Amino acid sequence: MAAKEIVFDQKARDAILKGVNTLADAVKVTLGPKGRNVVIEKSFGSPTITKDGVTVAKEIELENKFENMGAQMVKEVASKTSDVAGDGTTTATVLAQAIYREGSKLVAAGHNPMDVKRGIDKAVEAIVGELKKLSKPTKDHKEIAQVGIISANGDTTIGNIIAEAMEKVGKEGVITVEEAKGLETTLDVVEGMQFDRGYLSPYFVTDAERMEAVLEDAYILINEKKISNMKDLLPLLEQIARSGKPLIIVAEEVEGEALATLVVNKLRGTLHVCAVKAPGFGDRRKAMLEDIAILTGGRMIAEELGLKLEQVTLKDLGRAKRVTVDKDNTTIVDGAGKKEDIEARVKTIRAQIEETTSDYDREKLQERLAKLVGGVAVINVGAATETEMKEKKARVEDALHATRAAVEEGIVPGGGVAYLRCVKALEGVKVNEGEKVGLDIVRRAIEEPLRQISGNGGYEGSIVVNKVKEAKEAAFGFNAATGEYEDLVKAGVIDPTKVSRSALQNAASVASLMLTTMAMVAEKPKEESAAPAGGGMGGMGGMGGMM
């Protein structure tokens, strides 16, 4: 085991502070509408230019191991806030730096770190409670767009496209971000349920020009197992032929004789039919087939449910107004499922989302939920160069997260003003003498985001903070984009409550951990031994006889 280097007490806290300051100073220049850019070197390709705090934070590694630990802990604040709320990473970094900087001075002056920590925790709890009181739900398309615009660093196109996507697919809908082929940023919305499986044979196509099969007012057979034997299907196909309606078969596989017979009947015009492979694998496939069955009002044909293919009648089949199948995707629009059945299914999936610990499972469950209730929207991000594309795509993803957070927990006035309006909540907090120090640290730290936003815009932070503090209206603040003092909510400068809350909670959590640090342990750097001098290649003589 390699030897370790250990530092204690003040020396440890000073090293942490140096690391925290290095990282925070690089990140905080990006805060606010007039924030500056940071250029990050890449080992290959062009450098990345960004105004996103967490992207800058992730790139920073310091040479000194103890300072690096401080930087990494603040990096954790930024990425945790980004994971939970999608935005507010720079604000969280600024708050963590302010709390730790003030706190380390007071601990050095002899205050008990544990008292200071308790004071910080009580102050944060009071401010979070006040933020929730200040919060208002998002009312309309315009407010959602404003949240998106602010999170996308003032890009109105992105804000409006996100608001439109949210409107089309609803709160539960899935919105994905893709790279577009051209320069334009566009929105595609898929109505109904779509899954990524196409037709099993191109002979099922009804529209040869677009190479897709469109089945209007169709029956849907949902079968869990393979279908290869024709005689199992025959009784059902006779009933379908008599009804004159089209049929779509969704099964694990349709092959051999069964597929050939379906194709022949389709080409003859006896049956209007299309076969599709079931989506997903294993248990997830079963769950998705159940979803399709509930959405279309049919039953999943599975032997474990006591249902055999030869016994199926028309009433076991699902119905849909329209099914469109191309070579890669199947879309079911307007399924005939009962509203209460779909709602019960949605409730079950929501419960599973709450319980699951796997991010991958959660994502898949959310996709299933979206397909049942809303639909899927795809934002295609267009840009002129690859560098711009990377930066723009990251901004769209941030803005999307922030708008979701706003819909979830509501909005508060932006521009760092909401924190100032919560100071009054600290008056009634019961603390002892030692904890009061922690309370005062938070009181000063929550002014820091507004100071930084003003400073980045070229204004004097302290003057701005005092002017905003004097105002009585909650929404009155400083709009750094225009340089005006005004009602920020009306001006569209708003933050999701979840973002403001997470930023403060995460910053205080990590800063108070760092304040109570008494020792740091790191590996000693290995001393590089000098390379031995290179000698000649002895013993190579006498090779003349090899001719």
Swiss-Prot record:
Could you say which residues bind ATP here? 30-33, 51, 87-91, 415, 479-481, 495
GO cellular component, alphabetical, reads: cytoplasm
From the record, give the transmembrane residue ranges.
none
Would I find ATP-binding among this entry's keywords?
Answer: yes
Localization recorded for this chain is: Cytoplasm
Key word Isomerase present: yes
Region annotation (Disordered) maps to: 525-547
| First and last residue of the signal peptide | none
Q: Where is the composition biased (Gly residues)?
A: 533-547
Single GO MF descriptor = isomerase activity
Catalytic activity annotation: ATP + H2O + a folded polypeptide = ADP + phosphate + an unfolded polypeptide
The UniProt record lists the EC number as 5.6.1.7
Query: What functional role does this protein have?
Result: Together with its co-chaperonin GroES, plays an essential role in assisting protein folding. The GroEL-GroES system forms a nano-cage that allows encapsulation of the non-native substrate proteins and provides a physical environment optimized to promote and accelerate protein folding.
Its assembly, as annotated, is: Forms a cylinder of 14 subunits composed of two heptameric rings stacked back-to-back. Interacts with the co-chaperonin GroES.
The entry's family comment says: Belongs to the chaperonin (HSP60) family.
Official protein name in the record: Chaperonin GroEL 2
